[in-house]
């Protein structure tokens, strides 16, 4: 018999494509190429299949990670990497040391509607978000698209229980 305790209220916080920041990072790559310069030591340059997403913490305290909500409307793969960067891209570049482990990887196979994921890492990453929410209003993510998927094919959010 299931317990009859009330279910905790939940918050579903979407990951939103930050087009301005993605564009700014792409311009950085183009600028370096045009001037024939190299990236700073340890700098993470945005690759063509990567985009920057943000999560606005509408609540920062008393959150407990519940689950990822990821929908891919076609087969492919996305890797979501958190960053420790509090971004002011006109002043600071993203450095590789600011990329957080573990990453969350989600994929959809050709003949399936179901989303698979690297469950242990995705759960550990999600649990870290509850802690990071306490000290941030916004968190940035680097999302890498693979196997034919692009930003238009992804809908992602993080669901938290409100304690």
Swiss-Prot record:
Modified residues (N-acetylalanine): 2
Record-linked InterPro entries: Olfactory_marker, Olfactory_marker_sf
Pfam families: Olfactory_mark (PF06554)
Tissues where the protein occurs: Uniquely associated with mature olfactory receptor neurons.
Listed GO biological process terms: chemical synaptic transmission; neurogenesis; sensory perception of smell; signal transduction
Subcellular locations according to the entry: Cytoplasm
Chief location category: cytoplasm
GO terms under cellular component: axon; cytosol; neuronal cell body; nucleus; synapse
UniProt keyword terms in alphabetical order: Acetylation, Cytoplasm, Olfaction, Sensory transduction
Known role: May act as a modulator of the olfactory signal-transduction cascade.
Family statement drawn from the similarity comment of this UniProt entry: Belongs to the olfactory marker protein family.
Subunit: Interacts with BEX1 and BEX2.
Protein's UniProt name: Olfactory marker protein
Species this protein is from: Homo sapiens (Human)
């Amino acid at each position: 018999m299931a317990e009859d305790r009330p279910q905790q209220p939940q918050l579903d916080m979407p990951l939103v494509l930050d087009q301005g920041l993605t564009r700014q990072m792409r311009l950085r790559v183009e600028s370096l190429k045009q001037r024939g310069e190299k990236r700073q030591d340890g700098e993470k340059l945005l690759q063509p299949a990567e985009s920057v997403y943000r999560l606005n913490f509408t609540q920062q305290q008393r959150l407990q990670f519940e689950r990822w909500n990821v929908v891919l409307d076609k087969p492919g793969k996305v890797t979501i990497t958190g960053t420790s960067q509090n971004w002011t891209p006109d002043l600071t570049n993203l450095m590789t040391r600011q990329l957080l482990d573990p990453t969350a990887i989600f994929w959809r196979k050709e003949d399936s509607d179901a989303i698979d994921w690297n469950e242990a890492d995705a759960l550990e990453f999600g649990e870290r978000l509850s802690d990071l929410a306490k000290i941030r209003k916004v968190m940035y993510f680097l999302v890498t698209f693979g196997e034919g998927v692009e930003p238009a094919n992804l809908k992602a959010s993080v669901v938290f229980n409100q304690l």
